[in-house]
Amino acid sequence: LKGPLIWRWKDWIDRAFINRLNDLPKMVAPKVTGELATGVAEILAAKPLCGGCGAKVGRGVLSSALTKIAPPFDEVVTGAGDDAAVLRQSNGTFQVISTDHLRSLIDDPALMTRIAAVHALGDVWAMGAQPQVGLASIVVPQMSADLQARTLTEITQVATEVLSAAGAQLVGGHTTMGAELTIGFTVTGRKDTMPLTVSGAQPGDVLILTRPIGSGVILAADMEGHAHGRFVASVLAIMGQAQDREAAVLAPVAHAMTDVTGFGL
């Protein structure tokens, strides 16, 4: 048997089967009895911890810790609190530097590397600067030597590709083994004039979004098993898109730009 009607019949059978897997009864966690340490109940009842910006330490906790940092050196124009730190160079130009890392959201090292690299570069682009170099910080789960080598090769190849497309170069990094895959990058950039900072925003400025917001909501739903696959695929594709062209267009006319992550929208 063959023909389009057969394929439609098969598609109907397959979809009926998959729909049965999408409508499962909700599991109820057993009650924990006996004496418990303080905070155990809250931890057991908590939602899964996001691997992205939702995993960031709270603003209040972070601000409290940063107040204990010593005053910056003379060459430090801006430190903690902006997308990237700004350093004044001896020739009158400026260098920006930022670091970011993400715990793996998906079981795809290549795509996760692309997302993490674009995520880190976003801080440099938000300052209106040109990316310069990048250092990778990678935590890989325990696995065989062959699988480790293959995973690290895949990660470095994609990182080199993304950084090169941005006009930057991967110049080194650090690797360790840990509980789960974590990929991060420290990136530097340069700018002839003072980089854009969030403090440059003025009353009456028009707010321009260069990509959709709400990725955290979809990823949180995915962690709970409630997100549609096409929505997750769309989010991952958007997260892997570089924003260099948008930044190049807006930087000459914008009062301020920021990479909308963490404490953003």
Task: Give residue spans per PLM region.
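C-terminal, flexible cofactor-proximal segment of oxidoreductases
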Residues: 1-38
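Helix-biased detector of long, well-ordered alpha-helical tracts
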Residues: 37-265
